[in-house]
């Protein structure tokens, strides 16, 4: 299991939203690159970055901040938000991203995702953001009639590296991960699933280490880390101890 610390970018700053609402943004760090280095120094193995402005605009809007993050950390970085074309994907991967996350385009043009997986094997993830059980697009601003599992199944066998599943109704409000829908999705597809939205405490980390949740690749944590509700050392110690136990 991997715990992915999150950096959400708005106006070049590191922020957290509540329920995906751009009007409810709390600034946590004005220097995203320094935040990325801090997460690396704390012992995290990966970094999850979202260009919030880009998600709404439909194109990269915090490119300078992302470039600075890539220079500041040796950790692999996954980026989502506003990446909608093969050219955008190739440009970001060539700059050092480990993988891109495709959200809106996965709904609008699933064939592009499949083509991207062929062209960049192991480096394309799909972001499924859901509200009320239905997939949301355009930076969570628009709801679709598409079901979560219905969308995920479109990419079975395509080579998608992971599905990042976000429950918008829980994002940024520290109410705990929506375990029922997250595990239902993980059971329905062979693609690794990463849980996002609502991770609130070490109890969520412990829950992820239970046998029925081991199919998950990991979870993303934002506000709980920034607000000090999760101690990085304690969380990573739990994860590493579990990893050692599984490989013993």
Swiss-Prot record:
<dbReference type="InterPro" id="IPR001763">
    <property type="entry name" value="Rhodanese-like_dom"/>
</dbReference>
<keyword id="KW-0963">Cytoplasm</keyword>
<dbReference type="InterPro" id="IPR006062">
    <property type="entry name" value="His_biosynth"/>
</dbReference>
<dbReference type="GO" id="GO:0000162">
    <property type="term" value="P:L-tryptophan biosynthetic process"/>
</dbReference>
<dbReference type="InterPro" id="IPR044524">
    <property type="entry name" value="Isoase_HisA-like"/>
</dbReference>
<dbReference type="Pfam" id="PF00977">
    <property type="entry name" value="His_biosynth"/>
</dbReference>
<feature type="active site" description="Proton donor">
    <location>
        <position position="129"/>
    </location>
</feature>
<dbReference type="InterPro" id="IPR023016">
    <property type="entry name" value="Isoase_HisA-like_bact"/>
</dbReference>
<comment type="similarity">
    <text>Belongs to the HisA/HisF family.</text>
</comment>
<feature type="active site" description="Proton acceptor">
    <location>
        <position position="8"/>
    </location>
</feature>
<dbReference type="InterPro" id="IPR006063">
    <property type="entry name" value="HisA_bact_arch"/>
</dbReference>
<dbReference type="InterPro" id="IPR013785">
    <property type="entry name" value="Aldolase_TIM"/>
</dbReference>
<dbReference type="GO" id="GO:0003949">
    <property type="term" value="F:1-(5-phosphoribosyl)-5-[(5-phosphoribosylamino)methylideneamino]imidazole-4-carboxamide isomerase activity"/>
</dbReference>
<keyword id="KW-0368">Histidine biosynthesis</keyword>
<keyword id="KW-0413">Isomerase</keyword>
<dbReference type="GO" id="GO:0005737">
    <property type="term" value="C:cytoplasm"/>
</dbReference>
<protein>
    <recommendedName>
        <fullName>1-(5-phosphoribosyl)-5-[(5-phosphoribosylamino)methylideneamino] imidazole-4-carboxamide isomerase</fullName>
        <ecNumber>5.3.1.16</ecNumber>
    </recommendedName>
</protein>
<dbReference type="GO" id="GO:0000105">
    <property type="term" value="P:L-histidine biosynthetic process"/>
</dbReference>
<keyword id="KW-0028">Amino-acid biosynthesis</keyword>
<dbReference type="InterPro" id="IPR011060">
    <property type="entry name" value="RibuloseP-bd_barrel"/>
</dbReference>
<comment type="pathway">
    <text>Amino-acid biosynthesis; L-histidine biosynthesis; L-histidine from 5-phospho-alpha-D-ribose 1-diphosphate: step 4/9.</text>
</comment>
